[in-house]
From Swiss-Prot:
Pfam family, one: Gp3-like
Biased composition (Basic and acidic residues): 11-27
Function field: Recombination directionality factor that interacts directly with the integrase tetramer to activate excision and inhibit integration.
Domain of life: Viruses
Quaternary assembly: Interacts with the integrase.
Record field: transmembrane: none
InterPro entries, sorted: Gp3-like (IPR043991)
Protein name, as recorded: Recombination directionality factor
Annotated organism of origin: Streptomyces phage phiC31 (Bacteriophage phi-C31)
Keywords assigned: Viral genome excision
Amino acid sequence: MAKRSIWAGDEDNKPKKRETYADDTVGRFHSGYSETNERGKVVPVALDKWRISTGEQSVADAVAQLFGGTPVENEESTSENFIDVFTDRPKVPVIIEADGIHWDMKLWLNGKLKHHCDGFDFVSHADEEMIGQPCGCPKLFDERKAAAKEYDAPNPAITVTFTLADDPELGRFKFQTGSWTLFKVLHEAEDDVERVGKGGAVLANLELELVEYTPKRGPMRNKLVSYYKPTITVLKSYNDAIAD
């Protein structure tokens, strides 16, 4: 007879199994984190410096030495990357391969993927015959964004895969975001990677850049508004960087 788990009858409090990823990355870059507010609601919090998460202590120690911060294990995390390093760096030099920037568009509702396209055609669908067919999303950028805000259209799902220019041998990292601000100019970064890299890798800066402005209309009229946006700035081909 199999021995019962100590959590039998207490499943709600049973520690969750950590999620594992089917890729070979060693960590993730994040522009924010989640915390529980006074009302007990989990809310997102934006950062002005990068947070790096990993599941390997050696990687956490290495990025802390490179970019500042102290590795802290997040006991509540169910992710494979359960060690956080809140760095001192808003800008990190990275190496991006020719295929290192990927995006598509996804609409999630109640944890389920309801719409998956490339902005024009379905990328996946419950009906396989619909894959490759027009998805029906708005064509104009502002209309796409407005519809997504109302959960009537998908948001961008951007993934940037890279290694650290300061320690390429440490392994590959990912930055995943749904930022419309980055999405608006992502084609420029893609073009720069292709033009500068000429089929190879490029040296670039991954940065959280401060944006400040004063709206002339709306509830924040005549008040200073500030936020940090993720940016990708291609500097030179990696071959040229090595030669310097």
